[in-house]
Amino acid sequence: MAHKKGGGSTRNGRDSASKRLGIKKFGGEHVLAGNILVRQRGTQHNPGKNVGLGKDHTLYALLEGTVLFKKGTKGKSYVSVEPAKDN
């Protein structure tokens, strides 16, 4: 009988690259129009005032201002942009 295991091939050794999801601009931060606020899968955060929703559910600023996170009805999270004072 053999006293060593046969040297078979492994089925491990794969991993997917991270997708870099998450909040990119936090509450109180100054943003410019077009800045990405949140990258997400689905709508964990919903667009509020002055925020657009991309086809991959990315939230982005529609105008210059300050980021504001708020909880809405049923615990939903909304991301808004308060316009800058000079606009």
UniProtKB/Swiss-Prot annotation:
PROSITE patterns: RIBOSOMAL_L27. Pfam families: Ribosomal_L27. InterPro entries: Ribosomal_bL27, Ribosomal_bL27_CS. GO terms for molecular function: structural constituent of ribosome. One of its GO terms (cellular component) is cytosolic large ribosomal subunit. PANTHER family: LARGE RIBOSOMAL SUBUNIT PROTEIN BL27M (PTHR15893:SF0), RIBOSOMAL PROTEIN L27 (PTHR15893). HAMAP family: Ribosomal_bL27. Belongs to the bacterial ribosomal protein bL27 family. This is Large ribosomal subunit protein bL27.
